[in-house]
Amino acid sequence: RFDGIFRSPTEPGDPPVTHVQNARARYRFRLNLDTDLYPTLSFHGQLATGPVNNALTSDQDFGGITAKHPFFISEAWIDYHPTKEVQLQGGRVQAIFADNSRFLFDDDVRFNGFNEKYVKSFKKNDGYFSSVEFRAGQYIFSNPNVAIITPGSPLARAGEVVGTTGRSANLFHQGVLVNQSFNEKWSDQFGGDVQLYRHPNQIQLASTADGVVLLVQPGLGITLSGPLAGTGNATTTPGGAIYTAPAFQIGRLTYKLNYSGFQKGGHNFPVTLNLQVARNFGTGLNERDAMLAALQIGKITKRGDTSFLYVFSIKGANALISQVTDDDLGTGTGVNIRTNHFRFEYGIAKKVTLQSLFFIQNSLRSSGQYPNFFVPVSAFVPTSYRLQQQIVFSF
């Protein structure tokens, strides 16, 4: 199965002070490979385009003169499902709570590790509960392979204790989702989850020149053109490798209301309302909260279908880790933003969709506004307007 996107984005728009424009074309191409090894065991793999040092996108710019663009392993996992209720995955997997909402994680981020899910379904009851899902994920970010951290080690610059062994960075993500079905038209989902990061400063370290050499390039076997993209969090020094937040222990609550919708002119218009809030309980500092509210009307299933989406999101500089959260709501930063996002879709054909996306982005705080608080994009930067048009197809 193939799918892809052709994009024509303009960013960061036309700020009223600098009048900087960046208009360019992009494409993405993904090849999915799926097979059932046994009735209870299956394999999934995906090859995708995109810059190797940017995990937040599979888009490839029209550039490089005439050089060929690369194709990389984006996904590869084994799925074991001994019963209808249990699902176990291992490999390069999607985040266990991935929901394409542009909140917790970017749609293109994949993790090396393991997922577990248990779904308990219910018969019709007074509480309208249809099922409850218990989910957990354990992800491995790095393998420093450093027996003793010395004073000159990049790990020391990331806050690791000199004289100790270099440990891997990890994410442990677990939570529960409850599904309700009120009638044939109305349903909802609510729940919560917790993200516990271990040695999170290594993620920021990988976005520095010496960090990418230690933590990223040995695993790939190639030299990258630069550090990993996606910075945006507050750090203790300008461009430093230590987050201002001493820990990332993130709790999230989510609620989604679904309405099967209405018909007009032979087209269906389902309605979805999504609300999410998150707080980093690993710090008592300012800017540790994030939220998202989204309303979607319509869905593309055939030629002539239309859909409208509005998203409002705020992400504090100490709330989520910028290197793994969505990069479309923010230009040049994944957090420390307040963004209004509008999307209009039109079904050109059954599997071909024209999308028009518009982003209005403001930064929240500036460097030096709090002690040991330095961000790559400060609040004095003019409002950014970004228009992006793309054709999405799958076959």
What are these regions (language model features)?
Residues 53-76, 80-178, 201-242, 318-333:
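Surface-exposed coil loops of outer-membrane beta-barrel proteins
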Residues 30-33, 135:
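Predominantly transmembrane beta-strands of Gram-negative outer membrane beta-barrel pores used
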Residues 12-19, 62-65, 206-395:
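Outer-membrane beta-barrel pore domains
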Residues 32-34, 79-81, 117-121, 177-181, ...:
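Transmembrane beta-barrel domains of outer membrane proteins
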Residues 2-10, 39, 47-53, 94-96, ...:
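Transmembrane beta-strands of outer-membrane beta-barrel pores
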Residues 4-28, 35-84, 97-106, 238, ...:
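Surface-exposed loop and membrane-interface regions of Gram-negative outer-membrane beta-barrel proteins
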Residues 1, 24-28, 70-75, 111-113, ...:
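Transmembrane beta-barrel architecture of outer-membrane proteins
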Residues 37-43, 85, 121-135, 181-191, ...:
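Short loop/turn motifs that connect adjacent beta-strands in outer-membrane beta-barrel proteins
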